[in-house]
Amino acid sequence: MPAKRLGFSGKSVSLLLTDDENEAMSIAKQLNEDNNERKEIEKNILMKIDEMVKANPHITNDRVLVIDGEGWHQGVIGIVAAKVKDFFGKPTVIISRDGEEAKGSGRSVEGFSLCDAVFACSDLLTHCGGHPMAAGLSLKSKNIELFRQRINEYALKQENMPFNACNIDCRLNPALISVQLVEPLAYLAPYGAGNPTPLVGLYKMTLSQITPLSQNKHLRLQFKRNNSTVSVMNFFTSQQEFPYKVGDVLDLAVTLDINEFNGQRNVSIILKEIKPSVLDTKDFLQSQRNYEDFKLGLNLTNAQITDLLPTREDFAILYVFLRKSGGYAYPIETLVHKLDYKLSIGKIRIILDAMSELSLIEMIE
């Protein structure tokens, strides 16, 4: 529980045990304040990490991300590690320095044992423990950089370093979505570690409408397939940040729940992941990995070189697009879709790097 991570577990227990309604309300209020404090601490650390990545974007090329800062609250670095891992799709260790001593917490992707990777560096650590998907550690602050090098050397020795996967529990025809279908999912709750919320795949959905909500903080997206229409909520994404347009055919990973309002019960569909239907995810991720290997100075195979090496025509395709568009404010990954899959993501990144070095464009990560 978040309360436990910040040392407030006693309040949580008291809330569950008390028979006094006033005391329960008071404790609940304190817990809510504590939780808001946790969120603010977490937000501040994530903002600092964002600044670090913008200043040194090359650090995200590592197979295992190791990011450290002075005085970060040790009660939330595990949560932060999970969020950074989800964003970059890589095993992540967040380390908080306290003078000469430091403590870290890590989260991994399925298929890469983080505890094995950490244990391989145990001579640098004063304490370590964990399991394949998460690990905790302590070390001297002076050893952080060496730990970063060593754990990445370990990762580079893995023959098939896994990608962060979005595991779909079932594919669903949108015509079948109903309150009666979704209701039984409640029996699977409570959700959490070891029992994640079921993810449903909706495939080849045509985007038909984009509606901003709450002063453009969120989006309601309408999709169609055959004769079926569904409304999907995309939280914390503005219309300017959403890279797709009406008419695009997309694959969605969503969660389903029941929303009750004014006596009416309806299915609530929440967007978790989205990609163009025609995008070959495996090829895309491999091309991204090829680019990272190149930036790390690793020996590349002929196939990797072919994937990355752009022609004069490739440069022209991307440059003309950027010039006509007046730049590009969306994630670089979505350029593959915007360029009609003429260029791989690895090739796009190589071209952007070259254009940036020649001062033809300015890149802001």
Where are the predicted features?
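Hydrophobic helix-and-loop "lid/oligomerization" segment in the mid-to-C-terminal part
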Residues: 1-143, 213
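OB-fold single-stranded nucleic acid-binding module
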Residues: 143-147, 240, 244-283
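Short, basic interhelical loop/turn and adjoining N-cap
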Residues: 337-350
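Beta-strand/loop nucleic-acid-binding surfaces
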Residues: 226-245
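Short amphipathic alpha-helical interface segments
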Residues: 293-295, 299-340
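Accessory interdomain/linker segments of ATP-dependent helicases and helicase-like nucleic-acid enzymes
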Residues: 170-230
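A short, conserved structural fragment
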Residues: 353-364
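Long, charged amphipathic helices and adjacent flexible linkers at domain junctions
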Residues: 21-66, 152-172, 280-301
